[in-house]
Amino acid sequence: MSQSVLRLVDKDTMDKQKALEAAVGQIERAFGKGSIMKLGQRGSVVDIESISTGSLGLDIALGIGGLPRGRIVEIYGPESSGKTTLALHVVAEAQKKGGQCAFVDAEHAFDPLYARKLGVSLDDLLVSQPDTGEQALEIADTLVRSGAIDVLVIDSVAALVPKAELEGDMGDSHVGLQARLMSQALRKLTGTVSRSNTLIIFINQIRMKIGVMFGNPETTTGGNALKFYASVRLDIRRIGAVKDKEEVVGNQTRVKVVKNKVAPPFKVVEFDIMYGEGISKLGEMLDLGVKANIIEKSGAWFSYNSTRIGQGRENAKQFLRDNPAMAEEIENAVRANAGLIAEEMIGGPGGEDDDAGGAAGVGDEA
């Protein structure tokens, strides 16, 4: 198909502004109106929409109130660190706002009962369990192109097995096959994701690089492409246990914003993930309230506006659970002090988990 060729403009007869207008007009005739424009002409480019993560602290750490729409996000971490839980919370928050969500379960490990406990509406959730990596990414591409999906979760990159690997024998070597598959898929997806305003969340696993003597040996699967295309990368880790007397009832979790293209990165936030409940919003509210001097902590006692909430964290959480009006008041006060809290979350680029997701080595294909 023949395309218009830009013509040279005589500088003597037309100034630079007219030359620019002529060039823009020619581009629009060739590729359609809106193919080129000044940034100020489209307010949506400047104002980035977001979807809450279900964690008050993480929303503040991300700088825009949640994960950005129309972008690619990567959540990675060790096993049982809360990657899928965090992704399902995003799905639940999107559904609360009337959004349509899809879950591509490449690991074939989706637990609908747990998802329902986190607040996910199973009746409105599209779920696919593809056989191959190519099939999973093709399904993702089709859903994004429809323009009807608000959040799409792919769990996980490590489980996107190329067809050639599935059809081959167990001992066959397929070096770089998954990395090439991811690179090709992301090249196709990135433009469509932006136009459809869909949030794509890739969940990823951690592997160890072979022969690393200095620095962090951790890396993520699927090659380097996802690291470049992702606007936000979250490193999630389990750092301890939450106990009720002697019984372990949850995990203490730390999330580091390793990469952020829409706000300053390197913020670190900690929250509890309770078994059968998910992210503990009330526990997070207490911690952030103390940090912002909204809640006073004296010894084991928590107080708000001279009212004692409870002795010990679990008792204080139960008090807020029984008094939703006070909990909402504290949440609003915390959100009003988001800027102050965000400044205290800065962890810096250095740390034990920096290089996780570095260049994938040959050993990572295993």
UniProtKB/Swiss-Prot annotation:
Entry binding sites for ATP: 77-84
Keyword Manganese found: no
Pfam families cross-referenced by the UniProt entry: RecA, RecA_C
Superkingdom of the organism of origin: Bacteria
Keywords assigned by UniProt, alphabetized: ATP-binding, Cytoplasm, DNA damage, DNA recombination, DNA repair, DNA-binding, Nucleotide-binding, SOS response
GO cellular component: cytosol
Gene3D superfamilies: P-loop containing nucleotide triphosphate hydrolases
Subcellular location as annotated: Cytoplasm
Nucleotide-binding keyword on record: yes
Residue ranges, annotated region (Disordered): 346-366
Molecular function per GO: ATP binding; ATP hydrolysis activity; ATP-dependent DNA damage sensor activity; damaged DNA binding; single-stranded DNA binding
Transmembrane segments annotated in the record for this chain: none
One annotated GO biological process: DNA recombination
Function: Can catalyze the hydrolysis of ATP in the presence of single-stranded DNA, the ATP-dependent uptake of single-stranded DNA by duplex DNA, and the ATP-dependent hybridization of homologous single-stranded DNAs. It interacts with LexA causing its activation and leading to its autocatalytic cleavage.
Protein family according to the UniProt entry: Belongs to the RecA family.
HAMAP family: RecA (MF_00268)
The protein, known as: Protein RecA
Originating species: Rhodospirillum rubrum (strain ATCC 11170 / ATH 1.1.1 / DSM 467 / LMG 4362 / NCIMB 8255 / S1)
